[in-house]
UniProtKB/Swiss-Prot annotation:
Gene Ontology CC annotations of this record: cytoplasm
Enzyme class: transferase
Lineage: Bacteria, Bacillati, Bacillota, Clostridia, Eubacteriales
Organism of origin: Clostridium acetobutylicum (strain ATCC 824 / DSM 792 / JCM 1419 / IAM 19013 / LMG 5710 / NBRC 13948 / NRRL B-527 / VKM B-1787 / 2291 / W)
Record keywords: ATP-binding, Cytoplasm, Kinase, Magnesium, Metal-binding, Nucleotide-binding, Transferase
Function: Catalyzes the formation of acetyl phosphate from acetate and ATP. Can also catalyze the reverse reaction.
Keyword Nucleotide-binding: yes
Protein name per the record: Acetate kinase
Length: 401
């Protein structure tokens, strides 16, 4: 079985083609600037990169180019389109309806469309991508894998906001959580790595990238997560503010004479560590400002980022009445030993101690960085959302036979 994984953005498509027999990535790539001048597809096979600049007026043309790349005489990996067993689509928002991945049919498409108001930037391109794939591969089964699905096990007292209940009834305002596919993959991989059943563990998974979230995983299920109604909630991120007093929103609107859309843009795209530092949304630049340049604002942004994560680790340990495993993943979580060191500092009371030498030597593979005598296992687990999507797709399509 060979599955194509598609992640459609408003002007881009990320893709991977995976042989599920041994979970080998046969090809992967990125289509950029769809509908914009200078559109390009970058296709990678066996470590070689093939870049093609060509006009792409829409997502259908872009997906046709992806299929052409997979079938290419020089660097293709299949001879016939029928070798694509199924397509797994990453969908950001599935609302309350889906706690698992599902085979896409008319009802599922309607549900994804119904969630457009909850994810106006993400769900519309997903819908366009699915429709394009259906046109080009009408006989290939399609599966929707939702970022929100893993968090549907969160109890109501953790996902409800203390505003009039009628707004939940009318508008479904509640915590949804995101990065669910990553948290699901990483929690299961971490349990397997330490030889335990995920159902027997209390874990905190820290997905730390430009977008960042933390999830409490108890007995294999999400019981709380830091992101909320939108991905703006929770931690201080690259350009997102994270949690703060809601009154700040109306205060800024009044003081700056801006509307709801403008304040939303400010909090999503001009805040976070970039807003605090005035330097960058990239943690590498912030670390340089902190350790090398001794820039006060960079030092502040770095400290705020780490502090918020430490806060959530403590909170979720309390929620689960204990902690067996702390896991770091995502671009920063996997690659920044400095951030991991700062976050785990002075966490002895929770039984968290890391070995500095092991922490400094992480290298893109699952690693245990716990110090000897640490009651909590501290792990670095590279995430692989595409593989999780491909696995879910395999499971669902396999049941059709």
């Amino acid at each position: 079985m060979k599955n194509l994984v598609i992640n459609c953005g408003s002007s881009s498509i990320k893709y991977q083609f995976i042989d599920m027999k041994d979970e080998t990535v046969l090809a992967k790539g990125l289509v950029e600037r769809i509908g914009i001048k200078g559109s390009v597809i970058t296709h990678k096979v066996n470590g070689e990169k093939y870049v093609t600049e060509t006009p792409m007026e829409d997502h259908k043309k872009a997906i046709k180019l992806v299929l052409d790349a997979l079938l290419n005489d020089e660097y293709g990996v299949i001879k016939n389109i029928d070798e694509i067993s199924a397509v797994g689509h990453r969908i950001v928002h599935g609302g309350e309806k889906y706690a698992n991945s599902v085979l896409i049919d008319e009802d599922v498409m309607k549900s994804i469309e119904d969630c457009v108001s909850l994810a106006p930037l993400h769900n519309p391109p997903h819908i366009i991508g699915i429709n394009a794939c259906k046109e080009l591969m009408p006989n290939v089964p399609m599966v929707a894998v939702f970022d929100t699905a893993f968090h549907q096990t969160i109890p109501d007292y953790a996902y409800m906001y203390a505003i009039p209940y009628e707004y939940y009834d009318k508008y479904k305002i509640r915590k949804y959580g995101f990065h669910g596919t990553s948290h699901k993959y990483v929690s299961r991989t971490a349990a397997e790595f330490i030889g335990k059943k995920v159902e027997d563990l209390k874990m905190v998974v820290c997905h730390m990238g430009n977008g960042a979230s933390i999830t409490a995983v108890e007995n294999g299920k999400s019981v709380d997560t830091s992101m909320g109604f939108t991905p703006l909630g929770g931690l201080a991120m690259g350009t997102r503010s994270g949690d703060m007093d809601p009154a700040v929103v109306t205060f800024l609107m009044d003081k700056l004479n801006i509307n709801a859309s403008e304040v939303n843009n400010l909090l999503n795209k001009k805040s976070g560590i970039e807003g605090l530092s005035g330097i960058s949304s990239d943690m590498r630049d912030i670390k340089k400002g902190n350790y090398v340049d001794k820039d006060p604002k960079a030092m502040l942004a770095y400290s705020v980022f780490n502090y918020k994560i430490k806060q959530f680790i403590g909170s979720y340990t309390a929620v689960m009445n204990g902690l067996d495993c702390l896991v770091f993943t995502g671009g920063i979580g996997e690659n920044s030993f400095e951030n991991r060191r700062e976050i785990c500092k002075n966490m002895d009371y929770l039984g968290i101690k890391i070995d500095d030498k092991k922490n400094d030597e992480t290298m893109g593979i699952p690693m245990d960085i716990s110090a000897e005598g640490s009651k909590v296992r501290v792990l670095v687990i590279p995430t692989n959302e595409e593989l999780m999507i491909a696995r879910d797709t395999k499971d669902i399509v396999g049941k059709l036979k």
